Amino acid sequence: MKREDLQLYFIMGTSNVSHQEPLVVLEKALRAGITMFQLREKGPYALTGLAYEQFARQCQQLCQHYHVPFIVNDDVDLAVRLGADGVHIGQDDEQIAIARKKMANRILGVSVHSQEELQIAIDHHADYVGIGPIFATTSKSDAQPPCGTNFLQQASKLQPNLPIVAIGGINGINADIVFQAGADGVAVISALCESEDIEQTVSIFKSLNRIKR
């Protein structure tokens, strides 16, 4: 994984999109210039079983066409089965050590909320960590309270060689604050899923100093 792959990290599941077909939204985002994509299929109406796997493969094919890393959220076995570029897990998900073993040399991202969790991720050779929610978010029903940028600043100073992506309520207005705090990239859900003009929204993110393509 290249550090710059985190610069504009799009996360999406079918429940995050209401006004367009999810695959249409994904392709628009890919065409506009996102640098990484994570399939996060959650919620009461989330796809399951074969329907979920078929949708995952369609997302993967689009990412491959645009040469953008395809990451699966939580489901390590699905990531292995698909030959995904990586998997992202939380502290409450499958044990990080097991995920690292199954994913071999593919990308492993881990959500962290404290110095202790950060060290656990490092000890198990995570390729990057996700820190958040930085700001209030409605995209995750189980999201923790906003943590602001303090821990993000601490983590980036303590672990300057560890790629960090920030998530949670980030948009084109507040993203610059996150980059100044030390994030290598921003992960967004609503900012793109609810955008009326995805190309313009991506362009705003890319216009920031740290966003380059």
UniProtKB/Swiss-Prot annotation:
CDD domains: TMP_TenI
Xref: SUPFAM superfamilies: Thiamin phosphate synthase
Enzyme class: transferase
Pfam families for the chain: TMP-TENI
E.C. number: 2.5.1.3
GO BP term (any one): thiamine biosynthetic process
InterPro entries tied to this protein: Aldolase_TIM (IPR013785), ThiamineP_synth_sf (IPR036206), ThiamineP_synth_TenI (IPR022998), TMP_synthase (IPR034291)
Cofactor remark: Binds 1 Mg(2+) ion per subunit.
Keyword Calcium appears in the UniProt entry: no
Listed cofactors: Mg(2+)
Organism superkingdom: Bacteria
Reaction catalyzed: 2-[(2R,5Z)-2-carboxy-4-methylthiazol-5(2H)-ylidene]ethyl phosphate + 4-amino-2-methyl-5-(diphosphooxymethyl)pyrimidine + 2 H(+) = thiamine phosphate + CO2 + diphosphate; 2-(2-carboxy-4-methylthiazol-5-yl)ethyl phosphate + 4-amino-2-methyl-5-(diphosphooxymethyl)pyrimidine + 2 H(+) = thiamine phosphate + CO2 + diphosphate; 4-methyl-5-(2-phosphooxyethyl)-thiazole + 4-amino-2-methyl-5-(diphosphooxymethyl)pyrimidine + H(+) = thiamine phosphate + diphosphate
Keyword terms, alphabetized: Magnesium, Metal-binding, Thiamine biosynthesis, Transferase
UniProt-annotated binding residues for 2-[(2R,5Z)-2-carboxy-4-methylthiazol-5(2H)-ylidene]ethyl phosphate: 137-139, 169, 189-190
CC per GO annotation: cytoplasm
Presence of the UniProt keyword Magnesium in the record: yes
Residues given in the record as 4-amino-2-methyl-5-(diphosphooxymethyl)pyrimidine binding sites: 38-42, 73, 111, 140
Family: Belongs to the thiamine-phosphate synthase family.
Function: Condenses 4-methyl-5-(beta-hydroxyethyl)thiazole monophosphate (THZ-P) and 2-methyl-4-amino-5-hydroxymethyl pyrimidine pyrophosphate (HMP-PP) to form thiamine monophosphate (TMP).
PANTHER family per record: THIAMINE-PHOSPHATE PYROPHOSPHORYLASE, THIAMINE-PHOSPHATE SYNTHASE
Protein name: Thiamine-phosphate synthase
